[in-house]
Amino acid sequence: GFSIRAFGAEEQSVPNKQSSVQDYPWYGYDSYSKGYPDYSPLKTYHNLKVNLDGSKEYQAYCFNLTKHFPSKSDSVRSQWYKKLEGTNENFIKLADKPRIEDGQLQQNILRILYNGYPNDRNGIMKGIDPLNAILVTQNAIWYYTDSSYISDTSKAFQQEETDLKLDSQQLQLMRNALKRLINPKEVESLPNQVPANYQLSIFQSSDKTFQNLLSAEYVPDTPPKPGEEPPAKTEKTSVIIRKYAEGDYSKLLEGATLKLAQIEGSGFQEKIFDSNKSGEKVELPNGTYVLSELKPPQGYGVATPITFKVAAEKVLIKNKEGQFVENQNKEIAEPYSVTAFNDFEEIGYLSDFNNYGKFYYAKNTNGTNQVVYCFNADLHSPPDSYDHGANIDPDVSESKEIKYTHVSGYDLYKYAVTPRDKDADLFLKHIKKILDKGYKKKGDTYKTLTEAQFRAATQLAIYYYTDSADLTTLKTYNDNKGYHGFDKLDDATLAVVHELITYAEDVTLPMTQNLDFFVPNSSRYQALIGTQYHPNELIDVISMEDKQAPIIPITHKLTISKTVTGTIADKKKEFNFEIHLKSSDGQAISGTYPTNSGELTVTDGKATFTLKDGESLIVEGLPSGYSYEITETGASDYEVSVNGKNAPDGKATKASVKEDETVAFENRKDLVPPTGLTTD
């Protein structure tokens, strides 16, 4: 069957087919078939679409190019698809030969579809006929999903030029567009960058001999019918919930049970989930929410609940004063996905045989690099690269690549180990002002300094604040080994360091408003301060941190009891005891320990006490693994037993005690008949 779609005065049919394949309800087809305007079976065009039971159709592209295209809409054959989220993991799983060397497969595809047909958000496709624009976009998609070979875009579409009779103007526009679509650097300066919440959908084919599809936009689960108004869109805001251990941002904290509940507004069902290694992404309608921790991971305490509000695509956090303020905590969607490196091939590096050169870069998602500065000087700088970042050395000791999470640089203070400032806002102001006047990109110079010197001066000025670097001890630092190479700086460069600090200390506000910050996936590496800001790459994150639960030492009770028996025993007599205590490592214990009758003071491992019949001394808080020696004195005229065993020396001993212990002393004294006398 067919539904009807209207384009002005022209009406065209939309396929209305129902799937016979369970779990694969979406119909994928090539709409370039009989009835298409100017259709010719001799032309090799394709115009792929997906729809659901005759719904509105959505523009689609295919990947896995060695497999079949979907059949034409007038074919007796039909291909059925399952809709999936357009995540990096799904792309990699479903693509046969993806181009993933830069780790940005999803971002590259999103960029192509944002700028390709039919979206064309930056006018790259302007002047190109629709079917030709589809051809360009499809080839750009294959470049990344299938690693298709494109060596020179100026020679692209040679076969199509003949088959489709392309004129020279169309051909030139197509080649230029293809070049811009596949090269991230070509679009880095365009006014409209890909938003952080931009999404699309993947369609997995039920028949593995046919290509999978991806849509040029996000496709709803329940699409409207042709001619129907789409359902009123409930604006939702993407938020990621991430769990960290306080003070450790090298990985996400897994295993906490969290609850997200909407307390004002509607449209969100309470969600209980476990924290994971990437964060929990949720789409939230406007309203007020509470994130609470139901169960922390072992060894951690329960975090304080976080109340936040979603309004007009903004996230507001309730602060300690009870006010809602805009959330400043924004992070990249995929944690620890950014690479950074120390460029050993930088011109001028070590050219004067001094090791003050600091050539650190982070890779932006558009393929460019930005200058970055280190933070926490005694940790590792970024891993080394000898080919300008094309290949970056892994960390052999940790057997992994060092990667970074890109976050907004609003709260640098919590990452600093030894900051000079004690106020977070002042600290951030000083860093921003150093960046105002410091080295930010290639070509920056200052006075007579080389670029390497200017860059080193900027790094040292940053260390002055982030690490409390002492500029007077650069040469004597670390047993005269010097402060991270800065001891080699000449007087002119050091003078610029002081100039930067003087500027940072004045009362004017920084010109730098925001900056990127990069947090490593290893606590052995320095975090990185960026010199650029890429807000479109960031998404709101609700970050909940768990404090490690205080370690409560395992302790034990020692109960010493006294029983006096026998026909002539004195049950009112107080018997004297001396106790010697040692820790698990054999050292004498000293301290005051609570008992059932006050406190027992132990000095150099020794204490004394008295007990009479029916009494017990219960000593609490003794460390696990301790040893004791208890000796009763002044009972030589009694038979002494300990825990039912004869103890003529009146002693009880035990080593490595790891549980509660009871030591029962019994003193017995009976009348013994004189020798030779008998009784009748």
UniProtKB/Swiss-Prot annotation:
Location in or out of the cell: Fimbrium
Cross-link (Threonyl lysine isopeptide (Thr-Lys) (interchain with K-? in major pilin subunit)): T675
Domain of life: Bacteria
Sequence position, cross-link Isoaspartyl lysine isopeptide (Lys-Asn): K562-N667
Chief location: other
Compositional bias (Basic and acidic residues): 226-236
A GO CC annotation given for this chain: pilus
InterPro entries to which the protein is assigned, alphabetical: DUF7601, Ig-like_fold, Pilus_tip_adhesin, SpaA_PFL_dom_1, Thioester_dom, TQXA_dom
Post-translational modification: Proteolytically processed and assembled in pili through a transpeptidation reaction catalyzed by a sortase, which leads to a covalent link between Cpa and a major pilin subunit.
This protein's UniProt keywords: Fimbrium, Isopeptide bond, Thioester bond
VPPTG sorting signal (motif): residue ranges: 672-676
Site of covalent link Isoglutamyl cysteine thioester (Cys-Gln): C62-Q211, C374-Q526
Prodomain residues: 676-680
Cross-link named Isoaspartyl lysine isopeptide (Lys-Asp), sites: K243-D546
Domain CNA-B: 253-311
Region (Disordered): 217-236
Function, in words: Component of the pilus tip. Can bind covalently, via its two reactive thioester bonds, to molecular targets from host cell surface and can thus mediate adhesion of the streptococcal pili to host cells. Lysine side chains or a carbohydrate with a free amine group might be candidates for Cpa binding. In vitro, can covalently bind to spermidine, but it is unlikely that spermidine is the natural target of Cpa.
Quaternary structure note: Monomer.
Protein name: Pilus tip adhesin Cpa
UniProt source species: Streptococcus pyogenes
Record lineage: Bacteria, Bacillati, Bacillota, Bacilli, Lactobacillales
Gene behind this protein: cpa
